[in-house]
Regions:
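Short, surface-exposed basic-aromatic patches at helix termini and helix-loop junctions that form
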Residues: 10-14, 92, 112-123, 138-145
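Flexible loop/turn segments at secondary-structure boundaries
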Residues: 2, 32, 47, 107-111, ...
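Substrate/ligand-engaging "lid" and interaction regions
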Residues: 122, 126-179
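Short acidic, glycine/serine/threonine-rich loops at helix termini
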Residues: 4-5, 50-52, 112-116, 136-138, ...
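Conserved N-terminal Rossmann-fold NAD(P) cofactor-binding segment
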Residues: 1-34, 41, 48-50
Length: 179
């Protein structure tokens, strides 16, 4: 799988940032030595386990989605160990000012676990869900996304928009009524 993905990444880097040095390796020391930024998007267990997580959860009347409920918890438990290992490898080999940019789900569970188990880790846990919701709000309000200013608290599917303004006007209640 790594070889297939690396072919695509090589083309993207060549087109967008030809001066960027791209290393592809399965050797931890070679891959992480002096790295400044490490991008992580883990799917521990692959899509087969995602299907199982969701089906087992639904069978028992629970939410099966990969970030919330029983399905998300199972996925999170599988992901914590490899993420902690990645942090340890980065601590050992990467530059002293490294940053891990983690895009792995379930973001909230993985973020809390890494914060607890490796409190000094240099890791940013991110998700595009809030951005997608914000884009939908702009559609509902028939405005450009650049006209919105939002207050958001949380991470991924465990977050809340506490205030939404459109061109300076508070439209939070208007959006609530739409929902």
């Amino acid at each position: 799988r790594q070889e297939k993905v690396s072919l695509i990444v090589k083309e993207v880097v060549k087109d967008l940032r030809p001066s960027l040095e791209l290393k592809i390796s399965t050797d931890e020391e070679e891959a992480f030595t002096d790295a400044d930024f490490i991008m992580a998007q883990m799917r521990v267990g692959g899509l087969k386990m995602r299907v199982k997580d969701e089906q087992i959860s639904l069978k028992h009347g629970c939410i099966g989605q990969e970030t919330c409920g029983a399905g998300g918890m199972a996925y999170g438990m599988r992901t914590i160990g490899p993420m902690v290992h990645l942090i340890d490898v980065c601590e050992k080999y990467a530059s002293k000012t490294y940053w891990i940019v983690n895009y792995s789900n379930p973001a909230a569970i993985v973020a809390k676990a890494t914060q607890t188990l490796r409190p000094n880790a240099r890791i940013l846990n991110i998700c595009d869900m809030p951005v997608e919701v914000e884009a939908r709000m702009a559609e509902i309000l028939d405005t450009d996304l650049s006209n919105l200013e939002v207050d958001y608290f949380g991470l991924n599917h465990y977050g809340w928009f506490t205030k939404v303004q459109c061109n300076g006007e508070d439209v939070t209640e208007k959006l609530k009524k739409h929902v």
